[in-house]
Amino acid sequence: MSATEFIRLKKANCTNCYKCIRHCPVKAIRFSGGQAHIIQDACIYCGECFVICPQNAKWIYSETEAVKSFLLQNEVYVSLAPSFISYFDTGISCMKDALKKLGFAGCEETAVGATIVKNAYEQLIQEEKKDVLISSCCHTVNLLIQKYYPDLLHCLAPVVSPMQAHCRKLKQEHPGCKTVFIGPCISKKDEAERYMEDVDAVMTFDELEAWFNEEKIVIPKDFEACEMSKTRLFPKAGGILKTMVKNQPEYVYLSVDGTEQCMEYLEDIRHGNIHHCFIEMSACKGSCIGGPLMIKRKEKILERNLQIERYAGEKDFVVAQPDENTIHKEFENLEYSTFIPEEAEIRKVLLRMGKKKEEDELNCGACGYDSCRAKAIAVYQGKAEMSMCFPYLRKQSENMTDIITDHSLNAILVLNERMEVQRINPVAKKLFHIHNEADILGESVTTILDPDLFVDVLDKQENVYEKMQYLSMYHIYVETTVSYDETNHFLICMMKDVTEEVKEREKRVAVIAKTAEVADHVVEKQMRIVQEIASLLGETTAETKIALTKLKESISDE
């Protein structure tokens, strides 16, 4: 395992879309706390997650500052990957001049090292020591075999990569110098760290371009011809085969590119379906010119192929072939193995995921795994979270919604913008005398209610709260709240049956009115009695007054 994490995560950008795990050919990504984490021991540095991430949440560790520090202390030589022509759209002479302006002592094409490697391949085929021989130029392919097909390590050509071969040559020619490989590949950073005696640093074309821009170095477009540059074809699919002398009729020469296609070939080799073959194997579709950093630029692969074809010569670079032992390479068994749980444990996880029976296993792949079973195993291994299952989350959400709506004391209706019923809860069904939910779902709300209020809310985009209505069709009073969901374009209606409350209120009003009427009658009667008493008292008083007056007069006369 490399000490450095070359593909890193911007946590703030990760939005749990699971696109990276869906596209990772070896599922070397785990999710924890809603964040993607690369499993270094499992990663083959194909860069697929970096390319595919829609949020740009992955970034590549830059070695630019390390290279700048080299330039202050040492002579530094560049091994430039032949795919530079497709990235910078210029020839090697212009690139050499630009790199010298940055302070590099010199630059050569890695294609020189590719010549050494292809000569070694030809020699191995000539010796016929291997039934199946796989090219070992692509570090991602090497890691794929080392980690996932260690039983096929004997098929890997025991030869250094063009980068290693060339950087060794540069170090021999310039003792004490530092070497920097510059190319389109992320996995070369990992390879360099594993073989530090050959390569001191690896920069991507992106890093170099940023440095040129920083120094305001403009590279002219100039393409010089060079007849002896056949191995400039190495970065295109089938390019290695095109440079090789194929003089062994017993061997079939095959080319395969793309990690998944490589894995299919490796499965066939494992099962003994392929014999007497030399296989050029590249992890990137289109080989190096289809690498992760090339794809990010979005140029068409056909244009890149044409550039490579036009720039390559007809003959090999003139280079002394090193001794076989000096370019020999042994590949370590880096097998990545994980514990596969017992069937009972897998079933337990599936049950927790809501997969109670086989029909529940949708195998939709939204979580990034090919099947629900594979996802359950990943959950058990701690690589995946239960919540990564979209159908599971949806079901959980729907279950929660069902619980809320089904147990609500109010009638709930959900309508679309065409006023069609999308959902109705049990209280609403009872209120509107609906026996079968299917009879109303998808039907116009006009079959059960006057739509005017809903139309008004939709037109004005203004919610209505606790509006009192009398539904004459059902002889009930309701308090109606209608709100519009702009995001999902739904009208949500809640109705509270207040018929009993209204009746109680009407009864109270009637009692109060009756009581007031009785009180008025009593008051009126009392007033009458008072008036009668007053009248009688008045008459009596008058009679008494008359009698007393007469008595007074009679006494006075005497």
Regions found by a protein language model. Give the residues of each.
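Sensory coupling linkers of modular signal transduction proteins
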Residues: 484-529
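PAS/PAS-like sensory domain cap-loop motif
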Residues: 428-440
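PAS-family sensory/regulatory domains
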Residues: 437-452
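Sensory modules in modular signal-transduction proteins
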Residues: 396-429
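PAS-family sensory/regulatory modules and their coupling/dimerization elements
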Residues: 451-500
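Short, charged amphipathic alpha-helical "coupling" segments at sensory-output junctions
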Residues: 386, 390-407, 504-511, 522
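Iron-sulfur cluster-binding cysteine motifs and their immediate structural context
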Residues: 6-9, 15-39, 44, 48-63, ...
